């Protein structure tokens, strides 16, 4: 797994992840800036078979990466309307889940957008499994909790039904680590239990079921 970023930061400063496998590489949440240095670096790491993103806020540069490597662009059917820049060839659309490469599966969770997704990497965390979550599941600074965001700029939460849908979508998968959309923080261990526990805590706050002085 390789991280790819831009300095100084572009847009909201997200960090891309390159998942490398014996049958090709997946670029997840591509950064909003692409130049020859980045192309050479990714080519040296094996190039790209496919490009995708956790949600439409990170769709902007997918077409550029696709054209640079003649790679597939993968887009949830629910969010296809947000893909406004034409990729090298018609995008591959999917719903529910999509096995992209051996051990790498895209999982539609909903929440932030209808097609918001995570990538499950079975070989991550030393074989214990990892999620690449963008902000579908948002790792908090203490690296011991996660949260869920409806609109980050407007500071709006997700409703209970959406939180439960996100957790239910990832529940069948084995994972011990979560890489969010930025260099830090990373939820390094016990991630599945943390997601379940954090979701219940989040829902308690939505319902007002917290102490007067929490």
Give, region by region, the residue ranges found by the protein language model:
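Active-site HxH/HxHxD metal-binding segment of metal-dependent hydrolases
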Residues: 32-102, 197
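Zn-dependent metallo-beta-lactamase
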Residues: 1-22, 193, 211-214
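A structure-centric signal for secondary-structure junctions around beta-strands
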Residues: 13-15, 22, 88, 103, ...
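Residue-level detector of beta-strand structural context in well-folded domains
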Residues: 15-17, 96, 117
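Short Pro/Gly-enriched beta-strand edge/turn motifs at strand-loop
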Residues: 1-7, 99-106
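Structural signal for conserved beta-strand scaffold positions within catalytic alpha/beta enzyme cores
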Residues: 3, 53, 75, 92-94, ...
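Metallo-beta-lactamase
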Residues: 24-36, 49, 71, 81, ...
């Amino acid at each position: 797994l390789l991280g790819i970023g831009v300095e100084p930061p572009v847009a909201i400063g997200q960090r891309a992840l390159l998942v490398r496998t014996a049958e090709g590489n997946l670029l997840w949440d591509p950064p909003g800036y692409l130049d020859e240095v980045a192309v050479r670096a990714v080519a040296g790491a094996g190039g790209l078979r496919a490009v995708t993103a956790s949600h439409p806020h990170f769709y902007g540069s997918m077409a550029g990466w696709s054209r640079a490597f003649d790679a597939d662009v993968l887009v949830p059917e629910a969010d296809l309307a947000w893909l406004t820049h034409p990729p090298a060839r018609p995008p591959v659309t999917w719903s529910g889940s999509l096995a992209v490469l051996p051990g790498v599966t895209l999982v539609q969770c909903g929440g932030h957008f209808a097609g918001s997704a995570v990538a499950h990497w079975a070989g991550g965390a030393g074989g214990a499994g990892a999620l690449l979550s963008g902000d579908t599941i948002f790792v908090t600074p203490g690296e011991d909790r996660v949260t869920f965001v409806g609109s980050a700029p407007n500071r709006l939460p997700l409703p209970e039904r959406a939180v439960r849908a996100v957790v239910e979508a990832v529940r069948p998968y084995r994972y011990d680590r979560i890489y969010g959309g930025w260099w830090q923080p990373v939820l390094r261990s016990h991630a599945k239990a943390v997601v379940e526990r954090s979701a219940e805590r989040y829902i308690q706050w939505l319902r007002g079921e917290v102490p007067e002085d929490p």
